[in-house]
A protein has these predicted regions:
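Alpha-helix capping and helix-coil boundary motifs
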Residues: 13, 100-101
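Catalytic-loop motifs flanking and including active-site residues across diverse enzymes
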Residues: 16, 20, 82, 109
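Active-site loop/lid in soluble adenylation, ligation, and acyl-transfer enzymes
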Residues: 1-55, 59, 63, 67-71
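Long, well-ordered alpha-helical scaffolding segments within enzyme catalytic domains
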Residues: 101-110
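A glycine-rich, hydrophobic loop/mini-helix early in the fold
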Residues: 54-97
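Short coil/turn segments at secondary-structure junctions
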Residues: 8, 96-100
Length: 110
């Protein structure tokens, strides 16, 4: 199994957080990476293909000081507020130690 890098980038705005995830996902990471981060200010991150203008009220977000950003990955809108977020970038073979599927990935990371 490859040696994992653990990165804590602290609290940053949504654009910075998504830019780091994008760079890591584009293969800049030569070894598996587990990244921890926080959001300051709070943000709504929308999935890559999501039409968020239908589901996220940008006027309310603006009034509350909540950023709206797009994730480089799929999924739905997620509100990030007073939380610790993590991302994993690796070759799927780096997760085999914990077993198959999402549960196996969580066991490997833990």
């Amino acid at each position: 199994m490859a040696r994992w890098r653990v990165i804590d980038t602290g609290a940053n705005d949504g654009a910075y957080n998504m830019a780091v995830d994008q760079v890591l996902a584009q293969g800049v990471a030569k070894s598996p990476v587990l990244r921890f981060y926080d959001w300051d200010p709070p943000a709504v991150s929308c999935g890559y293909g999501q039409r968020f203008e239908r589901e996220v009220d940008s006027a309310v977000c603006s009034a509350l000081g909540i950023d709206i950003v797009r994730r480089p990955t799929g999924g739905r809108a997620v509100l990030h507020w007073e939380e610790l977020t993590y991302s994993v970038v690796c070759d799927p073979r780096d997760l085999n130690g914990g077993g198959e599927g999402v549960e196996g990935a969580h066991r490997t990371i833990a």
